[in-house]
Each structure stands twice: as structure tokens, then as C-alpha cells.
Regions:
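Glycine-rich, low-complexity intrinsically disordered segments
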Residues: 1-181
Length: 181
């Protein structure tokens, strides 16, 4: 019979990751991490390729598609997150159609450069980094500047959908931590 003290719940080394212990950074130096009030972690879908033989269907793995993520940013009077995001759109190549001589267009290269390197960092209770997602070639696919209402005193939330080519995960990038034996 196993010793009760060796069970995972009896160990002081076991601590679940907490959903609220994270930071988001896209490298612009202007948007502080605390404005990112919610973010989806990366996820993928592995496609399948069926092969038919007589009365049977055999499935083989196909292509991986990394699914878009959504982010929620709390807009701020002092930082103006909506203004930062519109500026990113302009940096991506968008130009307001104010004259017939506007020829600029948005490019993937411009979108990626405007977005910066998007990282989602997971932390412990004492702010040690325990995991980090880096979204490769990320760019903002959709922007919703929020809602205003006289019936509410809630903070204004900006919703973003971010698309990317793939994500890389680095487990415990700050060094080793104790593990259960």
C-alpha cells in the first residue's frame, strides 16, 4: 500500500498553474502587461486524410492548423489602447482613403512588423516564469473597440482576434525547478 505522504496532494512541490498568473507582451514598450485582461492560449487542429480500402477507411494525420486566439484589452485614458491598435494598423500599411492617390496596401510583412513578437508568459505565485508561448508571424485579424453604455460603469474592453502561423512553447525558460520523484 502506498504511503499517504507520497501522494501528490501531500507534496508542497505541487502547485497548479493559475489562469490569472500571466503576462502578455508584444514588444512595443507602450502597452503594459496589466491591460491585457484575458487571452486564449494557442491551440491547434491536426487534420486527417482518409484512405479508403475496400470496406474500410483508415485515417492518417494531415496538416496542422494553428487556431486564432482572442485577446481582451482594458482601454485606458492614460495609455489609449485603441489609439495604439489603430497606429499598428497604419504601420501595417493601411492608409485612410482621403484622396484618390492613396496606393498603400496592407502586407503580411507589415502586419507582422507592426504587431511585434507576441509572447504569453505563465508565472508562479512568486513571479517565476514557468512557461512561455511565442506566436510566430502573428498579426491582428480583427479589432472590436468595445461598447459604451449609459447603463454601465464597467471598464471599456477591446477585443482582438490574432492569427499566427505557429506557436512555440518554452517550458520553464528560467531554469530548473523541483519535480516530484
Amino acid at each position: 500500500m502506498a504511503d499517504i505522504n507520497s501522494a501528490f496532494w501531500a507534496s508542497h512541490l505541487v502547485e497548479p498553474k493559475r489562469s490569472y498568473k500571466y503576462k502578455v507582451d508584444w514588444g512595443d514598450g507602450r502597452t503594459p502587461w496589466y491591460l491585457f485582461s484575458a487571452v486564449d492560449l494557442p491551440k491547434y487542429t491536426l487534420g486527417e486524410t482518409p484512405v479508403h480500402a475496400l470496406n474500410h477507411t483508415f485515417k492518417y494525420p494531415g496538416r496542422i492548423t494553428w487556431d486564432d486566439i482572442t485577446m481582451e484589452i482594458t482601454d485606458s485614458e492614460s495609455i489609449d489602447a485603441a489609439g495604439v491598435l489603430i497606429e499598428k494598423l497604419l504601420q501595417a500599411g493601411y492608409a485612410y482613403p482621403t484622396s484618390p492617390n492613396v496606393y498603400r496596401t496592407i502586407s503580411k510583412q507589415g502586419c507582422i512588423a507592426a504587431m511585434g513578437i507576441l509572447r504569453i508568459t505563465e508565472m508562479t505565485w512568486d513571479e517565476r516564469i514557468i512557461g512561455q508561448w511565442t506566436l510566430k508571424n502573428a498579426w491582428i485579424k480583427s479589432f472590436d473597440s468595445g461598447k459604451r453604455s449609459y447603463d454601465s460603469d464597467d471598464a471599456v474592453k477591446i477585443s482582438l482576434t490574432v492569427t499566427y502561423d505557429w506557436a512555440e512553447y518554452s517550458a520553464n525558460p528560467e531554469g530548473s525547478r523541483p519535480t516530484m520523484g
